[in-house]
Amino acid sequence: MNTDTFMCSSDEKQTRSPLSLYSEYQRMEIEFRAPHIMPTSHWHGQVEVNVPFDGDVEYLINNEKVSINQGHITLFWACTPHQLTDTGTCQSMAIFNLPMHLFLSWPLDKDLINHVTHGMVIKSLATQQLSPFEVRRWQQELNSPNEQIRQ
């Protein structure tokens, strides 16, 4: 059973809408770790960005296999049921969870926003646009006691 109040899992007995998980007080979260296979699908109200740095991984997103190639950035609205099904040889992956209100506040292309909010999985064409060094630095900044650095 999932204990994260902002996430739903397919093994829960009580169903909840991912839209009910929204909170304007949520902040962006960044994980930098080895990916792990998920026993069930889950969903949450944030936009999820994944970057595997040293190997390809495979997700099941809305019952469709989605491969994320090493070094590529993949973005999707995580209210769509998703499950990491194959970690391959990947040992280092960045996972960004962006609250929807934050994502929508950025000056992004309207087509991109439309694609994401309609369940499309967006993949970068180019590789290596983000480094592990940058991910670690952003993690440190988000966890800084200095509010000006966190912003």
Q: Where are the model-predicted features located?
A:
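A structure-centric signal for secondary-structure junctions around beta-strands
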Residues: 46, 70, 90-92
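Short acidic-glycine-tyrosine-enriched beta hairpin
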Residues: 63-78
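Generic protein-terminus/edge-of-domain signal
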Residues: 1-67, 112
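A hydrophobic/aromatic-rich effector-binding and dimerization subdomain
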Residues: 2-28, 81-144
